[in-house]
């Protein structure tokens, strides 16, 4: 998936109020950028980090800049949580995610569960497949970890995926690791032990747990390979 161009390089001053970040651009201008990520962004929101921002052409946006990438531990990291659904759809269609091939239709944001919307609903002769995507930006010692903060929403999604399996459907929790230095994925038990317990319970009860790593450059984010999941 091509990133919007041009991207503006700068230095992170601070992230605050979850969705805002102050960035000093290369010309010395300080801008406030929208941060499309609700997580803690542990390890990715350190003052002084190099970041790349896109800029909307809209004249009505209060904050025209959006934070797209950050350089952490020497690698570019995609922090935009709106991308995983698009990346997953693209990778399903081009065959990269072979586990999810063979479906005729892909729909997004379909209501299901207890007031939730499934990220991707695949359908066809194989029946229905409910796919929940999760963006992963935290890596420690080569292992990508999720979540980076306690995630009641993520816990709820796992329970709903288990319910879909009980109803006879296929259900998949798909982790999208938007950085190239992760060699495996594991639940972040030290951060959210409840999520870790539920992820293992979901796997034991028929929910498929997949992880795919993206190649992230200044111009493109593209899923490239599956990662082992350590439960």
Curated annotation (Swiss-Prot):
Gene name of the encoded protein: sfsA
UniProt family annotation: Belongs to the SfsA family.
Domain of life: Bacteria
Identification of the protein by name: Sugar fermentation stimulation protein homolog
Ranges that cross the membrane: none
Species whose genome carries this gene: Geobacter sp. (strain M21)
PANTHER family: SUGAR FERMENTATION STIMULATION PROTEIN A (PTHR30545:SF2)
GO terms of molecular function: DNA binding
Short name of one Pfam family: SfsA
Organism classification: Bacteria, Pseudomonadati, Thermodesulfobacteriota, Desulfuromonadia, Geobacterales
